[in-house]
Amino acid sequence: QLITPDDLHWRPSNLMKIPNADFLERTGSENLSARLWRLPPKSANTLHKHIRQEEFYFVLEGTGRMRVGEETLTVPKHGGVLVGPDQLRQVFNDTEADVLWLVVGAPEELEFLQGSKSTGMDLKLIYPTEPTQLPKELDGVQWPPKA
């Protein structure tokens, strides 16, 4: 199924307000996720992990910065990082230019996060620590911006 740039719906992420677009939301894919993330200067996405999903992070524009566990990585344009399910990870941007990431993950794991109707999703499974904490490289930065 062809997906064109016109098919993408860009929106801010829930917690960190990072612009992102889901390539596969209209395809019905049950096993794969693929999303673009455009990190503005001096921003970060959530610190999180997964239950069984591996993710491949690929930099399309700019120079990517990422923490995986205790390690901080610098990822050049057209470079990538494979992250296992149980590793804490966070992409961030400590530069003055936007950074565009393509993040592909499999298998999809939404069913593992679904709790009962009364309790909802168990977010501690993917956010074992404070998800909105910023990396030390962004000390003194206010992100997400106050509305």
Tell me the role of every PLM-derived stretch.
Residues 1-32, 46, 114-147:
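A short, N-terminal "cap"/entry segment at the start of jelly-roll beta-barrel domains
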Residues 82, 96-115:
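A short hydrophobic beta-strand segment most commonly corresponding to one strand
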Residues 68-69, 77, 92-93, 112-114:
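Short glycine-/acidic-enriched loop or helix-start segments at secondary-structure transitions
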